[in-house]
């Protein structure tokens, strides 16, 4: 599994937050920026919120950029259920960015459900990575 620049910045943001510093870091780019979710949930965690606010900061600095947020799920559940869950995850991520001032027209959403796992395999150590919303530049 590759670790993107954004993932490293998200880690820095989490460390700064733990130290009482700013918890929002603007990424250098949006190369497969991801936020992760708990099982059967589309709720945005504080770590995910910081990540998404960093994405919004990037979009504010790059007004011509449009993105797509793809919601994903782990392999448990039916195809239909996971497609709906993936869409809720993508929509929840989009909502955070839009509430921070980004025009909703710049963000499209799609769900892949369980069809495009980030990591192949079974078990929670794998599934936790497949429950995500991934932002890519269009």
Per-range role (PLM):
Residues 1-8:
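Bacterial N-terminal signal peptides that target proteins for export
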Residues 10-13:
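Hydrophobic helical h-region of N-terminal Sec-dependent signal peptides
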Residues 15-18:
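C-terminal motif of bacterial Sec signal peptides marking the signal peptidase cleavage site
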Residues 24-54, 74-79, 117:
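Short, solvent-exposed beta-strand/turn patches at coil↔beta or beta↔helix junctions
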Residues 28-29, 125-129:
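Extracellular/periplasmic catalytic domains that process cell-envelope and extracellular macromolecules
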Residues 47-54, 80, 84, 88, ...:
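Extracytoplasmic/secreted proteins, especially bacterial periplasmic and envelope-associated proteins
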Residues 64-72, 87-118, 131-138:
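A non-catalytic structural micro-motif
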Residues 120-123:
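Short beta-alpha junctions and helix-cap segments that line functional grooves
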């Amino acid at each position: 599994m590759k670790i993107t620049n954004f993932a490293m910045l998200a880690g820095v943001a989490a460390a700064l937050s733990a130290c009482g510093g700013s918890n929002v870091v603007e990424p250098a780019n949006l190369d497969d920026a991801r936020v992760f979710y708990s099982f059967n949930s589309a709720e945005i965690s504080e770590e995910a919120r910081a990540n998404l606010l960093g994405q919004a900061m990037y979009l504010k600095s790059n007004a011509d950029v449009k993105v797509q947020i793809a919601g994903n799920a782990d392999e448990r559940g039916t195809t239909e259920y996971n497609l709906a869950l993936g869409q809720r995850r993508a929509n929840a991520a989009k909502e955070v960015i839009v509430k921070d001032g980004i025009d909703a027209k710049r963000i499209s959403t799609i769900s892949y459900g369980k069809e495009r796992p980030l990591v192949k395999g079974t078990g929670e150590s794998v599934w936790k990575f497949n429950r995500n919303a991934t932002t890519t530049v269009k």
